[in-house]
């Protein structure tokens, strides 16, 4: 996950909102701070050498038993802009970290978190994080690939820890591409999952079973975002990556 705090963004002379970056902003960022990109790409010799050096030692990690304390600290740092923030879509604030499970076992994760104040917004976030966790378990129970997740209480915050599917063990990486990147490269339509998937299937990039799964997941996602009053809460959660 490419991550950028306020200081790094200022060094790049880039807009504060990542969606407003131009290609030159993106390239400059990836060549100077691109050692932990989504997927398996490493861009430039400097970043490659940084990754290779990192492989010589265990990754910086949070002990599984210490997650409640450390996640509270990492969330506070993320809110204050002291730690780099992931360049990921979605409504919830989040940070990336690694969990040490004991011996030589590690799990790279993304952690979403609520605010601390007891407000209606926080209560909504708590409900949504719990629902997201349960939804992933339902999908996995039906044999559909879904990231493993866990709820962690961190002080006055509730955190949803989601295992990264683009990481394997301490240093392994798995290639990925977002729907946004793939669809925009060929079609540039900026619409929803089913329409984008239909275009990719039409052009031979995905097969019919994959298209059917994407349509099913989109319908499941829309239903899971129904609010208690029956109104749709947040299509923003169904972003394209």
Walk through the language-model features, giving the residues of each:
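Phosphate/dinucleotide-binding and metal-coordinating scaffold of catalytic cores
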Residues: 1-241
